[in-house]
Swiss-Prot record:
Location, primary (coarse class): membrane
Region (Disordered) location: 49-108, 688-726, 847-871
Purpose of the protein: Phospholipid scramblase involved in autophagy and cytoplasm to vacuole transport (Cvt) vesicle formation. Cycles between the preautophagosomal structure/phagophore assembly site (PAS) and the cytoplasmic vesicle pool and supplies membrane for the growing autophagosome. Lipid scramblase activity plays a key role in preautophagosomal structure/phagophore assembly by distributing the phospholipids that arrive through ATG2 from the cytoplasmic to the luminal leaflet of the bilayer, thereby driving autophagosomal membrane expansion. Required for mitophagy.
Family: Belongs to the ATG9 family.
Any Pfam family matching the protein: ATG9
Encoding gene per record: ATG9
Transmembrane feature ranges: 224-244, 280-300, 525-545, 556-576
Keywords noted in UniProt: Autophagy, Cytoplasmic vesicle, Endoplasmic reticulum, Golgi apparatus, Lipid transport, Membrane, Phosphoprotein, Transmembrane, Transmembrane helix, Transport, Vacuole
Topological region Lumenal: 245-279, 546-555
Comment on protein domains: Forms a homotrimer with a solvated central pore, which is connected laterally to the cytosol through the cavity within each protomer. Acts as a lipid scramblase that uses its central pore to function: the central pore opens laterally to accommodate lipid headgroups, thereby enabling lipid flipping and redistribution of lipids added to the outer leaflet of ATG9-containing vesicles, thereby enabling growth into autophagosomes.
Compositional bias ranges of the Low complexity kind: 88-98, 688-697
Name used for this protein in its record: Autophagy-related protein 9
Species name: Komagataella pastoris
């Protein structure tokens, strides 16, 4: 740069511009620097010329000549000069100069006027403000120009970055990272997967399926065996239908080898329609299934890393540990990890709200609605059959159709959340119309697929059960719970594996309850048949032992050898023997059914006083029915499914729409869930009909508190379509669900509803808690808290056992104790010692039917128990006073 520029920079900034390189190596381009300097010089020259001409025109004539040639120099080094305050090392010499000219003249131009320091003050006084502005502006051209190229927009290093796509769940940045995720360490990959969960419902479903499938190897083996089972059934059916000459097999007695009845090149003789078309469709479906298995394989690999590395659980441990332990480790992982920067899950509340209750609600979001609909009889699935009467026709096939027609319509397939338009009352007519169309469409599809699928299921069930019935004929009379019973007996937020375990435990008690009913006529007939068949089998076996070679091929009837009759009569003997009840069984159906209710959690009020009748037994047998009957109903259901889907269920479309709209509540961090799954007991008896809705998640992510925001929920009784069907509140469905949920998981984080639960239990006995503090929650919970502290086993509210059996009728001591022991809630959460104390306390507090004279003798036990739990005794006394009144 020019010397003038150097002097200016040195006086103002104390630096030497000759030694400064303002070249920017990041953006510089040597090929364009000269061109850039030329353009910049022309730009500033033009700007200065325009400005200078304007300045000259605006000045007076007297000042134009003075300003035309101006040169100021300071040689004095006066302390008053601000430039003299600078370090002397920054100056080129002992003198400092201010050079200005309005042309590009050199500094030694003799025409410049030199102004000495002593005259500078005088000359400066003659300059007005515009002169100073002109002076400052004229120095602008002397400032050194920075040599760099202005980069274009696409040249920026960060130009490849795209803003995150909020609406797209995948996101551009996340997708680019996901392509490189396989290069990460397994632990880092597992952490990345956990931190970038965008759909928590789907993720928890995958976690639960991995747990119930017992690990990676077991799940993949099951998937391939199921696929090969379908392939084998189709191949076997095709081969037997096309490649065997049945005419020769049945009529030709000279046939002894399979090759004699096998048709060569049998598949080349079949036509395109319908067999080859069916085979091509099956092949396409097989390819799609293989692709789905491949996608599942990728997900299972990630789940394996998640369980093995993050949760510290190997696949072998998954077969023995409880689900509660998995939930606890997920909660620990939740507390120790946060979302990654690239995660699109901005709802941090959903990650914080992840306790056992929230996890169950996410996994069973759809199932909770179905449990409520079946318990409230929203779906009309009954048909009238001649000579049989009304039959409840819910099969596994019908459940698949309901999931497609109803659940897939109300829930979003990607997020798993309920579709918001379905909750708008103004859309009621539209939703009902669309729901009817979907149901009718499913019915039409069933009409088209009925012939093919009926044949498939016949083959499947035949191959599945024939060998079992042949090797163990007693299984032909075995029973299991029907699909309708499984929905009826299932609790809210009860995971499938917990529910199956509960039903499996109840199987033995169910068989004992049914078999103890006297059936003398049938028993006598079965004993006679068993004796005849057993005698013939015994004779044939003895003769066969004497001469095995002759009698094994000896034909008793044309075409029927001894071996055939031994096998057939042996099966008949086994069936009759297992159908005869055990002689040691004691007939006491009431005690048996109450004991059974510990596991089924099902004891309807209309059964009260009729436990010994055939009516109650038949009602229970509709739930726990013959397995052979269920198989036949599953096969024949293809004849009735179109009728149910096209005519019966469309009439329920309005009710289904109203149910989803009026029994859905929104929970922050959780989304819309079924009202009954939130265990809101304190709003069951609200006269205004308001249901408390949890809006703000707490720190523990627990169950909603009573202080949550309220939303209007209608009376649930409007959905009860049968007069004999009790309302869900009277049946204590939610209470039993909540109690069993606490028993399954523990209530470390779910204690907020205990107060509302006890209040609801008091209300259910029609006792008004208005007499002071003797019915407060602390007294009711007194014994429960003491049991937790002493035994370490969590004992849930004992008040439920007291109130549940507090019926106004005469009871003996044995009956009262039986009522307490058989209570479906109390007996599952209380040990036998506490049940015995509870029964005695229940009896010894003035209940009807007791001799008052006998009470003082037993008061010792009562006082001893009262000292242990005064709150419970006060509650018992309160109940007694109500009964006496």
């Amino acid at each position: 740069m020019h010397k003038n520029n150097t002097t200016f920079l040195s006086r103002v900034f104390g630096i030497n511009s000759r030694n400064i390189d303002v070249h920017n190596p990041l953006f510089a381009d040597d090929s364009v620097i000269p061109l850039y300097d030329q353009n910049q010089s022309a730009y500033y020259d033009n700007a200065y010329s325009d400005y200078s001409s304007d300045e000259e025109d605006s000045k007076p004539r007297t000042s134009r000549q003075t300003d035309s040639n101006l040169h100021m120099t300071d040689h004095s080094g006066d302390g008053n000069d601000p430039f003299n305050q600078m370090d002397n090392s920054s100056r080129f010499s002992n003198s400092s100069s201010f050079h200005y000219n309005n042309t590009d003249q050199e500094d030694d131009n003799p025409e410049l006027l030199l102004l000495q320091d002593e005259d500078s003050s005088l000359n400066r006084k003659n300059l007005d403000n515009s002169d100073f502005q002109s002076f400052a502006k004229k120095t602008f051209n002397q400032i050194p120009k920075i040599k760099f190229q202005l980069p274009k927009k696409e040249d920026y290093p960060t130009s490849h970055r795209q803003p995150p796509d909020i609406e797209n769940q995948n996101g551009t940045l996340k997708s680019s990272v996901k392509k490189q995720i396989h290069f990460l360490d397994p632990m880092d990959k597992a952490l990345w997967m956990w931190s970038n969960v965008s759909n928590l419902d789907t993720f928890l479903h995958q976690v639960y399926d991995y747990y119930t499938g017992n690990g990676f190897n077991c799940i993949m083996m099951n998937k391939f065996t199921e696929l090969f089972t379908v392939v084998f059934i189709v191949w076997l059916f095709s081969f037997m239908g096309n490649c065997i000459d049945y005419d020769k097999l049945m009529n030709d007695r000279n046939v002894y080898q399979f090759s004699q009845v096998k048709i060569d090149k049998c598949y080349s003789k079949i036509g395109f329609f319908p067999q080859k078309l069916i085979y091509w469709l099956f092949f396409i479906g097989l390819c799609l299934k293989l692709y789905q298995i491949f996608l599942d394989y990728l997900v299972l690999k990630d789940m394996k890393l998640f369980f093995n590395l993050l949760l510290g659980l190997s696949d072998d441990e998954l077969q023995t540990i409880s689900w509660g332990l998995v939930v606890k480790r997920i909660m620990i992982l939740r507390d120790k990890n946060i979302n990654a920067i690239v995660s699109q899950n901005t709802d941090l509340t959903s990650r914080k709200r992840m306790n056992a209750h929230d996890i169950a609600n996410r996994i069973l979001r759809k199932e909770n609605y179905m449990i409520a609909m079946y318990n409230k009889s929203i779906l009309d699935l009954d048909i009238e059959l001649p000579l049989i009467g009304k039959v409840q026709l819910l099969t596994n096939t019908l459940q698949w159709n309901l999931n497609i027609a109803i659940l897939d319509y109300f829930f979003d397939s990607e997020t798993g959340q309920i579709n918001l338009p379905a909750l708008k009352e103004r859309n009621r007519h539209t939703i009902s119309t669309e729901l009817k169309k979907r149901l009718i469409f499913c019915g039409i599809i069933n009409i088209v697929l009925a012939p093919i699928l009926s044949i498939y299921f016949i083959m499947y069930y035949f191959l599945k059960f024939f060998y079992d019935f042949k090797t163990n004929p007693a299984d032909i009379s075995s029973r299991e719970y029907s699909p309708y019973a499984r929905w009826k007996l299932r609790e809210f937020n009860e995971l499938p594996h917990i529910f199956n375990r509960r039903l499996n435990i109840s199987t033995e008690s169910s068989n004992k309850y049914i078999n103890q009913f006297p059936k003398e006529t049938t028993t006598a007939l079965l004993k006679f048949i068993m004796f005849i068949s057993g005698s013939i089998v015994g004779v044939l076996v003895i003769v066969t032992i004497l001469d095995p070679e002759f009698f094994l091929n000896f034909e008793l009837t044309p075409g029927r050898t001894v071996l055939f009759y031994v096998s057939t009569l042996g099966a008949i003997f086994t069936i009759c023997k297992n159908s005869i009840p055990d002689d040691t069984l004691v007939f006491d159906p009431e005690v048996s059914l109450r004991y059974l209710s510990q596991f089924t959690h099902y004891l309807p009020q209309e059964w009260e006083g009729k436990y010994h009748t055939e009516e109650v037994k038949n009602d229970f047998c509709k739930l726990y029915t013959l397995k052979l009957y269920l198989v036949g109903k599953e096969i024949l259901s293809w004849l009735f499914l179109p009728y149910i889907l096209c005519y019966k269920l469309p009439e329920c479309a309005d009710t289904i729409s109203d149910f989803f709209r009026e029994f859905s509540v929104h929970v922050d961090g959780l989304g819309y869930v079924c009202t009954f799954a939130m265990f809101q007991f304190n709003n069951q008896h609200n006269e205004n009909g308001n249901a408390n809705v949890h809006q703000n998640g707490n720190g523990n992510g627990g169950v909603p508190s009573a202080k949550s925001k309220s939303k209007k929920v209608p009376n649930p009784n409007r959905f009860t379509t049968k007069p004999s069907m009790r309302d869900m509140e009277n049946d204590d469905k939610m209470i039993k669900s909540y109690m069993y949920f606490l028993e399954s998981y523990g209530n470390d984080e779910i204690v907020q509803h205990q107060q509302a639960l006890n209040r609801s239990l008091i209300y259910s006995t029609e006792i008004s808690p208005t007499s002071g503090d003797d019915l407060n929650d602390s007294n009711i919970l007194g014994l429960r808290q003491r049991n937790v502290a002493t035994t370490g086993k969590r004992q849930n509210s004992i008040g439920n056992g007291l109130i549940y059996n507090g019926q106004n009728k005469r009871l003996s001591i044995g009956e009262a104790k039986t009522n307490v022991y058989s209570n479906p809630i109390a007996s599952t959460v209380l040990d036998k010692d506490l049940q015995y104390k509870l029964a005695n306390s229940y009896i010894l507090n003035g209940m009807p039917g007791l001799n008052e004279a006998n009470q003082p003798a037993d008061r010792k036990n009562e006082r001893k128990y009262s000292n242990d739990s005064p709150g419970v005794m006060k509650l018992v006394d309160k109940i007694s006073q109500q009964h006496k009144a």
